[in-house]
Structures are given as C-alpha cells and as structure tokens.
C-alpha cells in the first residue's frame, strides 16, 4: 500500500510540475555592457490587436525589471517606437528601450488548459548615435494545464531580469 501511495504521489508530482512550467525561448544579441548610471527611457508600444492595455503593461513590466537592475527608467507614453521619439526627448536620455509586441495571446480562463503566449522583441538604442546596443527576444508560453499565467505580461519578468542583470552594470 505504501508503494502504491508513493508511486501515485510521485506520478502526481511529475504531472503537476510538467504542467505548471513556463517555457521560454530567448534570443540575445552579442553581449554588451550598459551602465546603470546612464539615463534610460522606455517607449510604450501600440497595443496588440484586441488586447487593450498590452502596450502600457509591457512597458511598466520592463520598467520594474530595469528598476531591479538599479536603473530608474522613464516611460515615454506618447511614443510607440524609437522612430517616433522627438530629437528633443532623445537629448534627455542616453538609451531608449523599445519593446515591440509581435504576438500576444491572453487566455482568460485559468482553468481552460490553454496557455498564455507572448513574442516580444526589445531593442535598446543609444540616443546619441541611434546605434542598436542590444536586441532581446522573448518567445514565451505558460504551459500550465491547471494554473495559467494571469496575463502574457507575466512571462516577461524572468527572462528579462536574467538578461538585463547580465548586461547592466
């Protein structure tokens, strides 16, 4: 009886762990080092179609991630991308962080068994030269049958924290 209970417990644990992991595929550019002493601003991308507030929540999550790396980043609410940022605004910052939402799937029903999905490309530009300093892509999926992520934005923190923790000194 103890063996059966141990087996059932082990089987349940393996199934539960397999069903609650989140998978990330990360594509990073060549490593570069950015200084947390310099000034950063984050553009607010356009919302993904039919996903209200996806742009602002993405930028706010990146702002939290950068704060965890010791960077006080401002949000540029009026600018959806680097090209739209005015020269006057660029003069105030050393780097502009541009998130681009390529795919966003928010499966609202937690118990539906459907995963939240996100494909996000984050580019950091040096404002003085418009040079791309870093490009980082997060391709993430919550694979929980039982407990989905609350929102695709929840899939940003872990891979972004690891990446920016390595390059911001």
Describe the predicted segments one by one.
Residues 20-22, 81-133, 143-146:
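Surface-exposed short loop/turn segments
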Residues 19-38, 126-169:
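C-terminal/domain-edge helix-coil "capping" segments
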Residues 1-4:
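Positively charged n-region of N-terminal signal peptides that target proteins for export
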Residues 8-16:
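Bacterial N-terminal signal peptides
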Residues 16-71, 165-169:
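A structural "domain/chain start" motif
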Residues 72-79:
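A short beta-strand-loop structural module common to alpha/beta enzyme folds
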Residues 46-52, 109-110, 144-150:
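Second-shell loop/turn segments in exported
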Residues 11, 32, 88-91:
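Structural motif
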């Amino acid at each position: 009886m103890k063996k059966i209970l141990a087996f059932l417990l082990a089987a349940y644990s393996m199934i539960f762990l397999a069903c609650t992991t989140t998978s990330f595929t990360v594509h990073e550019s060549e490593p570069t080092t950015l200084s947390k002493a310099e000034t950063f601003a984050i553009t607010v991308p356009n919302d993904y179609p039919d996903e209200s507030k996806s742009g602002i929540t993405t930028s706010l999550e990146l702002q939290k991630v950068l704060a965890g790396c010791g960077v006080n980043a401002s949000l540029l609410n009026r600018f959806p991308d680097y090209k739209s940022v005015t020269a006057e605004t660029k003069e105030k910052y050393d780097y502009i962080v541009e998130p681009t939402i390529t795919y966003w799937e928010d499966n609202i029903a937690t118990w539906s068994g459907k995963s939240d999905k996100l494909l996000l490309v984050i580019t950091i530009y040096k404002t003085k030269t418009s040079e791309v300093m870093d490009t980082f892509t997060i391709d993430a999926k919550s694979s929980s049958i039982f407990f989905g992520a609350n929102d695709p934005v929840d899939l940003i923190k872990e891979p972004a924290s690891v990446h920016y923790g390595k390059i911001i000194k």
